[in-house]
Amino acid sequence: MKVRASVKKICRNCKVIKRNGVVRIICIEPKHKQRQG
C-alpha cells in the first residue's frame, strides 16, 4: 500500500474507489495499491 498525495491508475486493472472520503486504488497487482492522504 502506497500513501500518496496524488493517486493515479498505473494499469488498466486499477480501479478508483472512494471509501469514507479516502480515495483508493485497488488492483489485481498488489504493488499498485494506493491511498490518498
Curated annotation (Swiss-Prot):
Origin species: Photobacterium profundum (strain SS9)
Protein name: Large ribosomal subunit protein bL36
One Pfam match: Ribosomal_L36
Upper lineage: Bacteria, Pseudomonadati, Pseudomonadota, Gammaproteobacteria, Vibrionales
Swiss-Prot/TrEMBL GO biological process terms: translation
GO cellular component terms, A-Z: cytoplasm; ribonucleoprotein complex; ribosome
Gene (UniProt): rpmJ
PANTHER family assigned to the protein according to its UniProt record, in alphabetical order: 50S RIBOSOMAL PROTEIN L36, CHLOROPLASTIC, LARGE RIBOSOMAL SUBUNIT PROTEIN BL36C
Entry keywords, A to Z: Ribonucleoprotein, Ribosomal protein
Family assignment from sequence similarity: Belongs to the bacterial ribosomal protein bL36 family.
GO MF annotations in UniProt: structural constituent of ribosome
